[in-house]
Amino acid sequence: MPLVELLTSAALGLSLQLLHDAIIRAKERSLITRCILDRLDATLHKITPFVIKIDTLTEEVDEPFRKVIEELKRLLEKAIRLVDAYAELKLRNLLRKYRYKRRIKELDSSLRWMIDVDVQVNQWLDIKKLMGKMSEMNTKLDDITRQPMDIIEATGRSSEEDGCTKPTIDIHFRWKNQTKEHEIRFIFK
C-alpha cells in the first residue's frame, strides 16, 4: 500500500475520532444547541462504516475516488474547526453562535449528501467484483480458444465415383475442454 494512501486512510480515521471528541466537548459546554450536535454525531456514526470501507479499499483506488477521499478529509477537518470554535463561543454572542450553527448544519447536510449520493461505495465494490469476474471469464475464454485443435481437411469421394463435377471438402475441428470433448464438422460440396 503506498504511503500516501495509508496516510489518507489513517487521517480519515483520526479526523473522524477528533471530530467525535470535539462534539462531546461541545455538548458539555452548550446545552442549548445539543440537538444540532446530536445530529452531526449521528451523521458521524453513519459515516463510520463508510470510512472503514475506505480503509479496506485504499490499496487500489482510482483517481476520482481518491478525490472523493480528499474531499471527505477536508470536510471532516472543517467540521472539527467549526465545532471547536462553536464550543468556545460565549452564550451572549448570539449572532456568531447563529452563524456557526448555520455552518454546522450546512456541513452536516454536505456530509450526508456525500455519503448518500456522491459516493456509492457499494456500487463501486459491485462493479469491481463484476470486472474481476469478467476478467476471469475472458481468461477462460482465451484458454479455450488457444487450445490446440486437430484440424483435418480431407477431400471426400472423387468426382468420378459420384458422377459430380464438384469436389467435396470435409473440415473437422476437435478440441478437449476439461472434461468434455467437442467436435465440429463442415462439409463443403
From Swiss-Prot:
Glycans are attached at N177. Induction: Expressed in leaves after powdery mildew infection (e.g. Erysiphe cichoracearum UCSC1). GO terms for cellular component: membrane. It is a single-pass membrane protein. It is found in: Membrane. Keywords: Coiled coil, Glycoprotein, Hypersensitive response, Membrane, Plant defense, Transmembrane, Transmembrane helix. Pfam families: RPW8. Residues 65-92, 126-147 form a coiled coil. Its main location: membrane. Residues 1-153 form the RPW8 domain. One of its GO terms (biological process) is response to fungus. PROSITE patterns: RPW8. The chain crosses the membrane at residues 7-24. It comes from the Eukaryota. Probable disease resistance (R) protein. Belongs to the plant RPW8 protein family. This is RPW8-like protein 1. The gene is HR1.
